[in-house]
C-alpha cells in the first residue's frame, strides 16, 4: 500500500509519484530548493518561485506535483510565472484542456474558462498558488 486515506486526501495530498497519478492527472516536475529557514523552503520551478512548508529534511532537488486544474494560464506576463507555449488545445465539455511546452517539460492544464481560448503556438504564462504545490517523497 503506497498511501492510505480518502480519495479526496489522496488526490489533494499525494505522498509520491504513483499516488499523484493514480487518482487523476498530475504534472510531476523537479524543483530546486534555493533557501531553507526552519521548515519553510523556497523552491524554484523554472522561472517561478514557491514558498512551501515541510517537516521533512529535503534534498536539493525535489519532485513536486502540480494538478492541472490548479495551474492558472494567462496571456499577460506575471511576475512569478512559468513561460510556456500552447502545444495542443482541446474543448472537453465544460472546460479546455491544454498541453504546453515549458522549461520544465510538457505541462497539462485544465481551464474552466471556455470564453477566453488559447490557440496552438500562443505564448502564455502559468502560475500556481504556493499551497497547491505538493512535495513528493520520491
Regions found by a protein language model. Name each.
Residues 1-48:
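Internal alpha/beta loop-helix hairpins
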Residues 26-28, 36-138:
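Non-catalytic connector elements of ABC transporters
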Amino acid at each position: 500500500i503506497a498511501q492510505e486515506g480518502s480519495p479526496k486526501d489522496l488526490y489533494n495530498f499525494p505522498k509520491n509519484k504513483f499516488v499523484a497519478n493514480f487518482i487523476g492527472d498530475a504534472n510531476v516536475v523537479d524543483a530546486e530548493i534555493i533557501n531553507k529557514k526552519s521548515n519553510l523552503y523556497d523552491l524554484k520551478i523554472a522561472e517561478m518561485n514557491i514558498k512551501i512548508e515541510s517537516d521533512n529534511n529535503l534534498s536539493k532537488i525535489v519532485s513536486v506535483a502540480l494538478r492541472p486544474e490548479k495551474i492558472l494560464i494567462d496571456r499577460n506576463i506575471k511576475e512569478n510565472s512559468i513561460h510556456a507555449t500552447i502545444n495542443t488545445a482541446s474543448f472537453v465539455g465544460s472546460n479546455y484542456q491544454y498541453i504546453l511546452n515549458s522549461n520544465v517539460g510538457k505541462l497539462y492544464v485544465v481551464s474552466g474558462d471556455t470564453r477566453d481560448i488559447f490557440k496552438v503556438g500562443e505564448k502564455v504564462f502559468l502560475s500556481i498558488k504556493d499551497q497547491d504545490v505538493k512535495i513528493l517523497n520520491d
